[in-house]
Amino acid sequence: HSQGTFTSDYSKYLDSRRAQDFVQWLMNT
């Protein structure tokens, strides 16, 4: 179960990183 929790938390982390990168890309365009 801890593995599944880690995976979901990690995917949330990646989503937040992707969102930040997207915002940076928009501001730089």
Curated annotation (Swiss-Prot):
Single Gene Ontology BP annotation: adenylate cyclase-modulating G protein-coupled receptor signaling pathway
Subcellular location per the Swiss-Prot or TrEMBL entry: Secreted
UniProt cross-references to SMART domains, sorted A to Z: GLUCA
Record's keyword terms, sorted: Hormone, Phosphoprotein, Secreted
Protein family: Belongs to the glucagon family.
Residue positions, PTM Phosphoserine: S2
Induction comment: Produced in the A cells of the islets of Langerhans in response to a drop in blood sugar concentration.
Name of protein: Glucagon
